[in-house]
Amino acid sequence: TVQWLNRQTVDVAEQRLWDIMVHNIAAYKKLIEYVGSLPPQLRMVRLGSDVLPVYTQRDWAYYWQQPDVVAYCQREFAKVGDTARLLDVRLSMHPGQFTVLASDNPEIVDRSIEEFEYHTDVIRYMGYGKQFQDFKCNVHISGRNGPAGIKAALKRLSPEARNVITIENDENKWGIADSLELADDLALVLDVHHHWCREGEYIQPSDDRYKRIVDSWRGVRPAMHYSYSRDTALPEGFAHDSMLDFPD
């Protein structure tokens, strides 16, 4: 993406970014309208992260701060958020694997905070982040510093980012017990499959750990993940991410 932009004149590159922005925001709205037509219990959707490409890239971050671009994002993302609220569609985002807030490398933490705040800007444009867990932006603990690293990073996040961040247990180093160290700081997402892969058990609703996870949501209806790796579970013609991208 960056290499393609750098090969173009500024006018061509900026026009391409504009076209992608227009397409991707419209795709968000269309997706939410579809999900809003489903039965109430299915009205939830994870939004793709690439809606505004190169947002945190040093050479191109300026583009997203230009007044006309900001004005378009404010106006059009607001329509997306209004649609979701009107149709009672619960929204979430999940920054990628390179968002490692608990890294022991300060530069990686800095970049991870930038990436999380990019997601928060999109969330803020849609009218969320105003209160605790009106939107879910989920990350794994990751990183060698574990729960302590997450707590340190939380202090550096914007109020809106702290309102929307959730932590999910994973199937490798950081499980439910580690997530629960953060239960007083943020909402926890239980991934049943990750827990099964790591511990070889399915957690039961009667389990005290389950209750503590629910309590971390402070009265908000909790979100939960049940992941699996079978690609054929997706209907034909659907993909995880249909955001517009750059040519080769």
Each PLM stretch: what is its role?
Residues T1-R90, T99-A102, E107-S112, D121, ...:
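Alpha/beta catalytic barrel-like cores
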